[in-house]
Curated annotation (Swiss-Prot):
It comes from Populus euphratica. Its EC number is 1.1.1.40. Keywords: NADP, Oxidoreductase. This is NADP-dependent malic enzyme. Transmembrane segments: none annotated. Disulfide bonds: none annotated. Belongs to the malic enzymes family. The keyword Oxidoreductase applies. GO terms for molecular function: malate dehydrogenase (decarboxylating) (NADP+) activity; oxaloacetate decarboxylase activity. Homotetramer. It catalyses: (S)-malate + NADP(+) = pyruvate + CO2 + NADPH; oxaloacetate + H(+) = pyruvate + CO2.
Amino acid sequence: SIQVIVVTDGERGLIYPPLSNIR
């Protein structure tokens, strides 16, 4: 199974998966 970790940015309040565009 593929587990996707959702990262939340408290400053912008955006939810994005761990892609190559991680800040």
